[in-house]
């Protein structure tokens, strides 16, 4: 008996709104069923890693905001840790608490967008509108500390650029008090919703072995039941002083990945609360004059301070020769920075490890045997942003 079935090839994207950026997906389909999914990337490639080689360590920081532009401060965090590792500089405790506080606010910023847009892709409009209201408040906190809502450029090797404005901690405290009820409202809309579960349960299943073999991290790995979190396994800054749980899934399907992200927001609220309670007084950046510019007051009094400031911002500071790899638990997974220095004021090589790159590679095996509508659901739970994938 001959098999006369003819497969069709379908181009999805790069303009399609459900591809979350500039993904071109070539689907080989047997009717409505997907046989293969071939992602074509590179449409947002800007040569970030090469550009960083021509910038001082200070000038390189804004490039990290533009990688995963949904969670900018976590990207800056990884670069700051890498430079600090080469410099062997001590970061003041207050600066460490501020960095952890804003990393967790960034996690909420990321997950609210992901869950809202995931619901919208599947056909639920309400969660996106409710969650964007909450994201707006976090973006205002960003604006208070850095002057910018998105590309914050706030973290620095050796600390943060400026102290928290007066009253900001109280505002953040009010936010985390009123935020959990809003999350409960979203959960009541989605968790047991029959249509939501039909679209997510048993779709895009990833076993523990597959998650490990493909190099998944973050909610993609924890959704498959592996409790791996760099904040616990390899803590940085003051995460070792924080009390929180690592939520995991059971089945590794789209529903588990959605639910892990939902639970992670509750854990982030706990960490933020602890940061506010334990926040010490003191300096917000290292006192090493090679890294920290003089204050405005000093520059008005001393010509040497003015020259020091000028040289620091034009030539930058020299970093000893060496290499290091530092990774943070970004909202999407393990975001790592490998820095290689030959001495001098510019990195010789800066390699960026983006979690979304590995996750997108798994789209092919996750989509096989599913309908085309399910591919949209799977892309949404991958939580991909092409700023970091294409770099």
UniProtKB/Swiss-Prot annotation:
One of its GO terms (molecular function) is NADH:ubiquinone reductase (non-electrogenic) activity. One of its GO terms (cellular component) is plasma membrane. It is an enzyme of class 7 (translocase). Its main location: membrane. Signal peptide: none annotated. SUPFAM superfamilies: HydB/Nqo4-like. Its EC number is 7.1.1.-. Keywords: Cell inner membrane, Cell membrane, Membrane, NAD, Quinone, Translocase, Transport, Ubiquinone. It is a peripheral membrane protein. Coiled coil: none annotated. It catalyses: a quinone + NADH + 5 H(+)(in) = a quinol + NAD(+) + 4 H(+)(out). It is found in: Cell inner membrane. NCBIfam families: NuoD (TIGR01962), PRK06075.1 (NF004739). NDH-1 shuttles electrons from NADH, via FMN and iron-sulfur (Fe-S) centers, to quinones in the respiratory chain. The immediate electron acceptor for the enzyme in this species is believed to be ubiquinone. Couples the redox reaction to proton translocation (for every two electrons transferred, four hydrogen ions are translocated across the cytoplasmic membrane), and thus conserves the redox energy in a proton gradient. NDH-1 is composed of 14 different subunits. Subunits NuoB, C, D, E, F, and G constitute the peripheral sector of the complex. This is NADH-quinone oxidoreductase subunit D. It comes from Rickettsia rickettsii (strain Iowa). The gene is nuoD.
């Amino acid at each position: 008996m001959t098999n006369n079935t003819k497969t069709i090839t379908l181009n999805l994207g790069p303009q399609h709104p459900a591809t979350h950026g500039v993904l071109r997906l070539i689907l080989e389909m047997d009717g409505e069923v997907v046989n293969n999914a071939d992602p074509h990337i590179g449409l947002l490639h800007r040569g970030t890693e090469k550009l960083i080689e021509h910038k001082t360590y200070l000038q390189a920081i804004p490039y990290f905001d533009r990688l995963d532009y949904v969670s900018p401060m976590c990207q800056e965090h990884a670069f700051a840790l890498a430079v600090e590792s080469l410099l062997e500089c001590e970061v003041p405790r207050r600066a460490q608490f501020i960095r952890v506080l804003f990393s967790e606010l960034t996690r909420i910023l990321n997950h609210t967008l992901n869950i809202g847009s995931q619901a919208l892709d599947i056909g639920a409009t309400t969660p996106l509108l409710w969650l964007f209201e909450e994201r707006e408040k976090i973006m205002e906190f960003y604006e208070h500390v850095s002057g910018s809502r998105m590309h914050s450029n706030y973290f620095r090797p050796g600390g943060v650029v400026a102290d928290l404005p007066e009253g900001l901690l109280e505002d953040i405290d009010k936010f985390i008090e009123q935020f959990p009820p809003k999350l409960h409202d979203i959960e009541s809309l989605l968790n047991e919703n029959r249509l939501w579960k039909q679209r997510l349960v048993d779709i895009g299943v990833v076993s523990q072995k597959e998650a490990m073999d493909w190099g998944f991290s973050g909610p993609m790995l924890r959704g498959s039941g592996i409790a791996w979190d760099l904040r616990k396994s390899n803590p940085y800054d003051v995460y070792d002083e924080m009390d929180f749980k690592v939520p995991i899934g059971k089945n590794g399907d789209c529903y588990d990945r959605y639910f892990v992200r939902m639970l992670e927001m509750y854990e982030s609220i706990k960490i933020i609360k602890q940061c506010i309670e334990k926040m010490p007084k003191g300096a917000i950046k290292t006192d090493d004059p090679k890294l920290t510019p003089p204050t405005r007051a000093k520059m008005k009094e001393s010509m040497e301070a003015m020259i020091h400031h000028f040289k620091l911002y034009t030539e930058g500071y020299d970093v000893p020769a060496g290499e290091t790899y530092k990774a943070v638990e970004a909202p999407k997974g393990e975001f790592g920075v490998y820095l290689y220095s030959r001495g001098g004021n510019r990195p010789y090589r800066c390699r960026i490890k983006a979690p979304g790159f590995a996750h997108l590679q798994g789209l092919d095996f996750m989509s096989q045997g599913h309908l085309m509508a399910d591919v949209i659901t799977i892309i949404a739970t991958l939580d991909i942003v092409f700023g970091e994938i294409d770099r």
